[in-house]
Amino acid sequence: LHLCDRRQRVMCIRDSFRSNEDILSCIKLVIIDEGHLLGTDKRLIVNEMFYEELKYHVKANGGRFLLLSAVLPNAEDLSEWLTDSTDNVYKENWRPSDERIGIMEWNGVSVNLNWKSTDAERNSFNPNFIMRQKLPKKPKERIMHYFPENKNQAIASTAYKLRKFGPVLIFVGIKKSVFAIAREYEKCIQPEEQKFRFRNKANWRAFKLACIESYGEDTEWVKFAKQGIFCHNADLISDVRIPLERLMRSEKPRVIIATSTLGQGVNLGVSTVIFSTLYQSGNPITKRDFWNIAGRAGRAFVDHEGKILVAHDITKKDENKINWERKMISAYLNKSNIDRAESGCLELIRTLKTVAQLNGIAFDNLINLLAENRINEIDESLDEVNDLLDLIDDGLLSLHNSNNFEGNTLEWIDSYFTKSLAYIQAQYYEDITGDEVLDFIKARIKGITKKVGIEKSIWESIVSSGIPINSDLQIDEKLSEIISIVQSYIVSDKTLEERISLLENIEDVIRDVNIYKEKFEDSVDIKEIRKKWLSGISMSDIVQHENAVNIVTQHYSFNMPWVLTVSYTHLRAHETRRHLV
């Protein structure tokens, strides 16, 4: 079994395993790629709980874990967690090339490269690496313009000059910046340069056709790719993303401009990585993510060294601001500052303990409230507390089901969860103990079984659904309405219009189900998007509507089928119960 950081893939694997004992009984080796991806992000907490589940089955099969990471400073914690020993760690410092790191400083007139290299044989400072040039005046233009004249143009110019060492990857923090920098890079390409030639014509044709089908003839995805400028962001639909990533592996583009969706998902052969920013959607990226992306430099397999640069715009800033930003960049460039891999489940428990304390609730009382499902008494923001518990509840129920062949005993928890990552790392904190972690888990499982019942058949039904418990229960409550809608459709003529109406009516019923409303991005054109999507209209037509890309790629391609599958499972169980009666 090979797991990597693709959210949908991990969820699909988890759901398949929970509902298939034959697969579970065969697992002997689990390989976790990008194993450092643990923490407080929702999907990371869910993944951590999944690994806790896997441990049960792998141990029962006499199997092993192999965790891989290039940025893991506390490997011993994870070794103890997955192998019951801190000694099962193998470290290798080999790289396919040397590493050179530095700051790409733009002062409004020139780009200076300030390298952090300790190698005395090479210059640690390349002044005026790029100098701005006057641009010819256009008719009736009075103001003199230069190139580069802003940070994006400076980054594009630097990447263009560094292309002679091999492909360059430019990391950007938000989706719209991908094309913004691509447009500036396009200006750097000289008319006399040879046309970019694709080595694998089949891959190029597949990508081009997918783009035209999805975005239309004039899409910028194709326009830039023709020039060796490969762009990648989270807006890519899978029909385009897959051939694009295949194309990236087979070609040597001039430049790749991407958000972190590419940096952690695809192994790239690039010589240089330039960070246009150290922020992602307004928040600082972690030092762990920084080095995971930076580690792509020097993988073109023809490099003596991989170059890593962080862009720094010092125009119109005072000295204090400039120095503060330089220190921040230097902190990222220091590998000893890489973030530890930490248990998101432990942080969740600490957070709820803190929330309770702020509301004057002692930990013992918090435990009682969790066991009795009196969540509304913990904090006024009931939905937020429930959302946090939803991240771990189905995983806890799955483990409780596996450890209880008969009955509803909690005796297994002490021996099992003393080997959990949350318990192991509790020793590093003063505000939580390992025993409190165990008490929390026992109380939460009591609350879960009180909420869903103590019948194993119910546990197994909820666990195999793969969605959070609260959402599963909400769907079950709406089952009679869904049955009525389906029955009306069954006696209809089953035309395309009636099928579209069927989906619309079901969506209206489940609109307030947690997992539906959490993921759904509304649009004034939702009816038109739904109709065109189900009618097989070209994606290039659909994407013209508001939020169409997210609605199709996230909602109709992933989330909605997931919810419908759970609804079908409940319907089937309902039919079985009805026949038994």
State each model region's role.
Residues 414-572, 577, 581:
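C-terminal accessory/interaction regions of large nucleic acid-associated machines
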Residues 6, 10, 14-26:
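Conserved helix/coil segment N-terminal to the catalytic DExD/H
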Residues 296-321:
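Conserved segment of the helicase C-terminal RecA-like domain
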